[in-house]
């Protein structure tokens, strides 16, 4: 199970939101590349980038920052989400050195877009399912759909989606613990490996996820916990490596 540090980008800065609310953000720094270096130096094997402005705008806004991080760490797998709603955007990011693009809103509104992109960019497509009480939210989490997250995961089972990033919105940025049960349900809904996100606070959450990782959980994204020091990614990754051996 991979421990994946998150770098959320808003107005060019590295921030963290609470429950996805843009007006409830904490700015951690003005140099996202420096934060990326900090996590790389601690042994991160992948980075999770989110263009928060892009998620609301429906197109990349912090793309230059994403490109700068990708160029600074050419050997490091990077995944990007937020505002990815066209083949052109996906192609742009992949050419810039990003390894995986996360399709969120468009996956809910036009599932066939995911099917097509998996054919066009095989091995590079991740679906982001952000759920509130089990139902998928879209447009920077501003809207909640009537689509169940597990149903959508099952829909993509044979499309060639690389992974699913599953976020429990109610827990995101709240430091209240990860929703293990919902994450396992998501993993069981399809054969696609699931990356857990939202609420990861400390080693208790990592242990809880590692215990059920065999259900199909391939990673855990952590943001506020590593910025505020309640979780050490070196310790967390070392634990996951030992448990998986």
Swiss-Prot record:
Keywords: Amino-acid biosynthesis, Cytoplasm, Histidine biosynthesis, Isomerase
EC number in record: 5.3.1.16
Subcellular location, record wording: Cytoplasm
Domain of life: Bacteria
Active site: 8 (proton acceptor), 130 (proton donor)
Record bears the keyword Isomerase: yes
Enzyme class: isomerase
Gene Ontology BP term (one): L-tryptophan biosynthetic process
Associated pathway: Amino-acid biosynthesis; L-histidine biosynthesis; L-histidine from 5-phospho-alpha-D-ribose 1-diphosphate: step 4/9
Any GO molecular function: 1-(5-phosphoribosyl)-5-[(5-phosphoribosylamino)methylideneamino]imidazole-4-carboxamide isomerase activity
Catalytic activity: 1-(5-phospho-beta-D-ribosyl)-5-[(5-phospho-beta-D-ribosylamino)methylideneamino]imidazole-4-carboxamide = 5-[(5-phospho-1-deoxy-D-ribulos-1-ylimino)methylamino]-1-(5-phospho-beta-D-ribosyl)imidazole-4-carboxamide
This protein's record includes keyword Cytoplasm: yes
GO cellular component terms listed in the entry, alphabetical order: cytoplasm
CDD domains: HisA
Similarity comment: Belongs to the HisA/HisF family.
NCBIfam families: 1-(5-phosphoribosyl)-5-[(5-phosphoribosylamino)methylideneamino]imidazole-4-carboxamide isomerase (TIGR00007)
The protein's name: 1-(5-phosphoribosyl)-5-[(5-phosphoribosylamino)methylideneamino] imidazole-4-carboxamide isomerase
Gene that this sequence comes from: hisA
